[in-house]
Amino acid sequence: MAYNPRMSIIPTSQQNSRTRKKEEEADAFMRLPDREIVGCITDIGITFTVADLQKPNAAHVQQIFEWFAELLLNATRETVEPAMRAAAEDIAGEYADIIPSDTRNLMGFYVSLRRLLFECGITDFSFNDLYKPTYDRLVKIFSYLINFVRFRESQTAVIDQHYNKAESTKTRIETLYGENQENEGRLEDMKRNRKAMEAQVQQKTMRNEELKKRLLELRRNQERVAARLEEAKQKKGELTTALEQKTHEKVTLKQESTKLRPYVLQSASDLQENLAELRDILNNDKSHIDALDRRARALQTSTDSFSVVSTDVASCIKILDEIASELAKEEEELARNAKQRDALSERSNNAREVERTETMLKRQLSKWMERTEKLREQSNHKAHEAKEKMHELRAIHRQLTEEHTEKGKEMEVRRVRIEQTEKKMLDLKENIENEVHSAHEEYRKMEAHIKLYIAEMEQAIA
């Protein structure tokens, strides 16, 4: 017993009688005289008399209800038929034609009319009111409808204002949703392009690193070749000085031999001794000539190696030119990547702002819908609700101004960050340009040194 709900002391019959009395009092308050009802219906363009109200005709009553539905709900046969056809196709599928179109349209019209009358205050509307109308029921329904229309006409300005705001918010939401979809598509495309560009940049950086390693190896080989060339030049100078000394000694020996010839012819033993000496000298000269030939051959091989080195240097120069062109291309690609990244950040920021505005508009729309429902339900307290709405609108305005200021601050912070990143990119670009310029200067110096070495080699060979 402890868990059972508390039972009322008043009997149910008394409660039902009280509710009936309240309903009867409300009906009596809302009930209009027959002539007033007939006059209002005839004013809308439908012929209707007191006799038609007292002895109603189902077709005539349905015509009046159709006019009220068209006036208050914009529900006509043209608007109801497509929706009911789609519903029949969803339910029955291929057998949708089994349900007649008249019954479908009647069901849709009945649902919309019942919703309208429920908003007017009639909760017990049924098909009997359409097909078997009675005098009391028609007077009650028409009285409630006419009072609702009068109230609606008295509040047309407020209703139109809220309706226009709701429509504007709906159109704004639709446009923002479309823009959001477009921006999402663009953002996906830009993400794909960014991934592709990042892959290309990684490939270019790997290739650049490989080229840098190759360039360092070529520089080392060039230094080695230059050292070997200097050693060969030194050896060549030493050999040329030795050859000059030997030729000078040979000339002096020939002169001495010519001077000593008449003295040698005096005796055979002396001649034999002189011959032996001359043979020794001749053998020494031959060995010396052979050594000189060997040195000449070594010099020839060194000149051949110098020619090979010159071809290697020319290939190195071509590779350096290619590297410079590729570096320029990479700089252009880096600039394009930077621009695309900036565009991506801007579009992502725009998409976020659109989403924020969309959420704000949805919240505002829900608030406006709740307010319109409150206006319909609380018609007796208009002034108080208007004051509350003014306070709420001021609060919303303050919130919007605060959000606007916050967004402005965020935009300024983002702009400062973008400017800082642009400055960093410019500094990096200047550093890269300085490195490229220094590399070009080193390359020119090396080219000048190589040309000097080649010119000296040609002079030495000549």
Curated annotation (Swiss-Prot):
Keywords: Cell cycle, Cell division, Centromere, Chromosome, Coiled coil, Kinetochore, Mitosis, Nucleus. Pfam families: Nuf2, Nuf2_DHR10-like. It comes from the Eukaryota. GO terms for cellular component: Ndc80 complex; nucleus. GO terms for molecular function: microtubule binding; protein-containing complex binding. Residues 172-462 form a coiled coil. Gene3D superfamilies: Ncd80 complex, Nuf2 subunit. The keyword Acetylation does not apply. The keyword Aminoacyl-tRNA synthetase does not apply. GO terms for biological process: attachment of mitotic spindle microtubules to kinetochore; cell division; kinetochore organization; meiotic chromosome segregation; mitotic spindle organization. Residues 1-21, 337-358 are annotated as: Disordered. It is found in: Nucleus; Chromosome, Centromere, Kinetochore. InterPro entries: Kinetochore_Nuf2_N, Nuf2_DHR10-like, Nuf2_N_sf. Component of the NDC80 complex, which consists of NDC80, NUF2, SPC24 and SPC25. Belongs to the NUF2 family. Acts as a component of the essential kinetochore-associated NDC80 complex, which is required for chromosome segregation and spindle checkpoint activity. This is Probable kinetochore protein NUF2.
